Amino acid sequence: MSDLKLSPLVIKLGGAALDCAETLSKLFGAIAQYQNQAQRRIVIVHGGGYLVDDLMAKLQLKSVKKDGLRVTPYDQIPIIAGALAGTANKMLQGQAIKDGINAVGLSLADGGLCHVEELDPELGAVGKATPGDSTLLQAILATGAMPIISSIGLTAQGQMMNVNADQAAVAVAGALDAELVLLSDVSGVLDGKGHLIATLDAKQADALIAGKVITDGMIVKVKAALEAAQDLGRPIEVATWRYPEKLAKLFGGESIGTRFLP
């Protein structure tokens, strides 16, 4: 991994981290410290499922998931886009600015970064993102700013789409040819006894899914990580944000969670 410092780093932030200002502050502190020390270009991609859940509950709308993915009726996408591209994005940007980071808030559509199409008619306005044109993103990174990208995209027809944030991060990393780290509530993939699995390939993952050891939203995360490892031709790490003091090691190439092998 001698070219590690040269390649950009995409960090996917998700889960309950977005719900706690103290955690976010520690996270951005660790990210800023690493960025300064390594002089590395960093991009954040985020979801914000809990914000969507809160908003749906307030509006008395039901949240439905299919195979770990949120069903997004087309008449609800303006609300969900508002929560993710609006509230969640500005909240993260605000925290980053507070911690001394020059942050720029973006979506998957900006500069044609990702192509987005409907994933499955049964899921509604849920998109699949594929890598697009990273020229604008590269220009922003060249200024030393840190892009913070929501998982809301637009189709070629201008239709708003909600993209799973893990899948969105994979597409952004593909567009940039970047290293990718997926940070979440969990420390990585656990075996049937609750122990962390250090490395995982597609065959092992399929066996764990078939054996119901990997379930629900973790299936989406595992599939996204395996797809990323294949597409990018490099290992992808799934780890927790809960120990900010370990993140510099992780960003520098050490494994602290589960490493997915191409």
Curated annotation (Swiss-Prot):
Gene Ontology molecular functions: acetylglutamate kinase activity; ATP binding
Catalytic activity: N-acetyl-L-glutamate + ATP = N-acetyl-L-glutamyl 5-phosphate + ADP
Subcellular location: Cytoplasm
InterPro entries: AceGlu_kinase-like_sf, AcgluKinase_fam, ArgB, Asp/Glu/Uridylate_kinase, NAGK-NC
Enzyme Commission code(s) on record: 2.7.2.8
Record-listed substrate binding positions: G48, G49, R70, N162
Site feature Transition state stabilizer, where: K12, K221
Record GO biological process: arginine biosynthetic process via ornithine; L-arginine biosynthetic process
Gene3D superfamilies the record matches: Acetylglutamate kinase-like
Record keywords: Amino-acid biosynthesis, Arginine biosynthesis, ATP-binding, Cytoplasm, Kinase, Nucleotide-binding, Transferase
Cross-referenced Pfam families: AA_kinase
Pathway: Amino-acid biosynthesis; L-arginine biosynthesis; N(2)-acetyl-L-ornithine from L-glutamate: step 2/4
One GO CC term on file: cytoplasm
Domain of life where this protein originates: Bacteria
Family: Belongs to the acetylglutamate kinase family. ArgB subfamily.
Function of the molecule: Catalyzes the ATP-dependent phosphorylation of N-acetyl-L-glutamate.
NCBIfam families, sorted: argB
Name of the protein described by the UniProt record: Acetylglutamate kinase
Organism: Vibrio cholerae serotype O1 (strain ATCC 39315 / El Tor Inaba N16961)
The organism's taxonomic lineage, starting at the top: Bacteria, Pseudomonadati, Pseudomonadota, Gammaproteobacteria, Vibrionales
Gene that this polypeptide is encoded by: argB
